[in-house]
């Protein structure tokens, strides 16, 4: 199956994301209409095998009902060429660090800004060491808006110390998160991966670019990892 057409499917916390060649799509699995659109998309797509990864087990059965008529493979930790020394690690975290480690050929630290943010480490011996998980940017903004609806939405300011509510909310969310992940990166580099290349990915990564300009932004790390795993195991 060296020339097989592979449809990659990421079952995430908020969306189903697909990649077929250069074509990418997203569907909300919480929405019956969107799921119907996903099913219609599969019917008209030309692929030989569907390879999927699931980081939202609460959605998997629902999605399997849609894809079970197609030849498919589920990516598990055992399919990924990493020595995993952590426990109960989400497949999305493993896939992004695997892709980054292949790109950089050095120890890597990967920051993923999604529903949750993660900061994960692969050392020079190809060991996935683990990392951090926290509340993602979008989730923070939603929680703050719900808890304090009178606050204005965030807006970046050139002032070092914010003088407006909008700038204060920006610093308390965007900038605070940037400082948090930088602190974690520095902490993990001291712990034995001092020369690690730092990658950034995830749905909210573009919103953090100006605050982390010295890191390498790669918005397709997850799909890159999935493609590499598919090639290693089934193609």
Indicate residue ranges for each PLM-predicted region.
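Short glycine-rich phosphate-binding loop at a beta-alpha junction
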Residues: 47-56, 73-75, 193-203
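Conserved phosphate-binding loops in N-terminal lobes of ATP-dependent enzymes
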Residues: 2-67
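Short, structured loop/turn "capping" segments at alpha-beta junctions
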Residues: 107-111, 128-129, 150-159
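Active-site rim beta-loop-alpha module in soluble metabolic enzymes
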Residues: 134-191
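Active-site regions of enzymes building and remodeling cell-envelope glycoconjugates
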Residues: 24-27, 66-76, 86, 212-220
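Long hydrophobic alpha-helical segments typical of transmembrane helices together
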Residues: 194-235
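Gly/Thr-rich phosphate-binding beta-strand-loop-beta motif of the actin/hexokinase/Hsp70
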Residues: 1-26, 100, 106-128, 144, ...
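Conserved phosphate-binding catalytic cores of ATP/NTP-utilizing and phosphoryl-transfer enzymes
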Residues: 2, 81-108, 223-235
């Amino acid at each position: 199956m060296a020339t097989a057409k592979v449809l990659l499917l990421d079952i995430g916390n908020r969306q189903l994301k697909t990649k077929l060649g250069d074509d990418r799509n997203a569907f909300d699995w919480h929405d019956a209409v969107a799921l119907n659109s996903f099913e219609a998309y599969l019917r008209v797509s030309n692929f030989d095998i569907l390879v999927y990864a699931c980081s939202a087990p609460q959605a998997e059965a629902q999605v399997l009902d849609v894809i079970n008529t197609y030849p498919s493979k589920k990516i598990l930790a055992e399919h990924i060429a990493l020595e995993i020394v952590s426990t109960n690690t989400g497949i999305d975290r493993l896939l992004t660090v695997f892709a980054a480690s292949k790109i950089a050929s050095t120890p890597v630290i990967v920051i993923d800004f999604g529903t949750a943010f993660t900061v994960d480490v692969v050392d020079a011996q190809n060991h996935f060491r683990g990392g951090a998980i926290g509340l993602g940017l979008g989730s923070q903004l939603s929680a703050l808006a719900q808890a304090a609806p009178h606050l204005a939405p965030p807006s970046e300011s050139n002032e070092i110390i914010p003088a407006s509510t909008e700038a204060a909310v920006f610093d308390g969310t965007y900038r605070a998160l940037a400082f948090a992940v930088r602190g974690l990166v520095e902490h993990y580099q001291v712990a034995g991966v001092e020369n690690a290349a730092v990658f950034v990915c995830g749905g909210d990564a573009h919103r953090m670019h100006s605050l982390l300009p010295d890191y390498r932004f790669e918005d397709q790390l997850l799909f890159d990892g999935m493609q590499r795993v598919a090639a290693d195991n089934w193609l």
